[in-house]
């Protein structure tokens, strides 16, 4: 267990306070380079921030959402971009926990500190149903923190499936996609929210997909009832927490 994790009533407590001064110090560098400094990511990783919502069986801490959001707000008081990109990366551990177990087993096979980005907008996605899974290509915008991540979650609408038209999230390793530098914003400069591009279709097996309605209906594969919270409720709060922290600054 990280030195930042302390057992409280058999539940770990993550303390991000020791890295807040570094995050604040790094803010100008992140703004200039339009992505979070490596040292900020590594500091959050060492404090266990990215493992807060990850199941214990994969090396995580299974912290409560309340504790996770409090940490995100504390970070945002020092730098909103770090809370935005870092929080989005961290919350994906929860989505992996409610996907088919084989997906998490692959992602966290080598380390529980694997980082995952996302872009859920399906507008630029092309999806084809094939034997055992799907072929995916297209372009997805605003993938915050993607330059620090070795996996990504991408949204797509399936129109040729026996179950009818529906939305899924597709989990892909870094070798399956490119990151195109498109992030030249007026705010949240350091989030590095660049485009994810897949020019030639890549295969995504069925177990590395997440049906949207499963997330809404609280379908999960964990013993902890915390994972019954609908996925969307976690995500909308992780992107609103930075505003609360910034307002407190």
Task: Label each region the model flagged.
Residues 36-46, 51-149:
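Glycine-rich flavin
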Residues 115-118, 185-189:
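Short Gly/Pro-enriched turn/cap motifs at secondary-structure boundaries
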Residues 187, 193-249:
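Glycine-rich beta->alpha junctions and the first turn(s) of the following alpha-helix
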Residues 21-28:
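Short, basic, glycine/proline-bearing loop/turn elements
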Residues 139-177, 181-182:
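DPxDG-like acidic metal-binding loop motif
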């Amino acid at each position: 267990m990280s030195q930042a994790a302390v057992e409280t009533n058999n539940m770990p407590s993550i303390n991000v306070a020791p890295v807040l001064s570094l995050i604040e110090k790094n803010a100008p560098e992140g703004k200039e380079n339009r992505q979070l400094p490596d040292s900020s990511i590594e500091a959050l990783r060492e404090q266990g921030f990215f493992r807060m919502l990850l199941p214990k069986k994969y090396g995580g801490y299974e912290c409560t959402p309340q504790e996770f959001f409090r940490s995100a707000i504390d970070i945002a008081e020092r730098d909103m971009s770090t809370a935005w990109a870092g929080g989005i990366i961290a919350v994906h551990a929860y989505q992996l926990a409610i996907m088919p177990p084989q997906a998490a087993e692959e992602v966290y096979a080598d380390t529980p500190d694997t980082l995952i980005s996302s872009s859920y907008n399906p507008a630029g996605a092309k999806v084809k149903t094939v034997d055992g899974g799907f072929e995916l290509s297209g372009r997805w915008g605003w993938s915050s923190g993607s330059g620090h991540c070795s996996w990504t979650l991408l949204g797509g609408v399936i129109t040729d499936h026996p179950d009818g038209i529906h939305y899924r999230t597709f989990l892909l390793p870094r070798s399956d996609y490119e990151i195109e530098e498109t992030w030249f914003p007026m705010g949240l400069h350091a989030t590095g929210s660049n485009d994810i591009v897949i020019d030639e279709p890549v295969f995504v097996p069925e177990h590395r997909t997440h049906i949207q309605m499963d997330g809404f209906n609280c379908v999960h594969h964990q013993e902890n009832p915390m994972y019954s919270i609908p996925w969307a409720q976690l995500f909308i709060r992780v992107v609103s927490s930075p505003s609360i922290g910034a307002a407190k600054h």
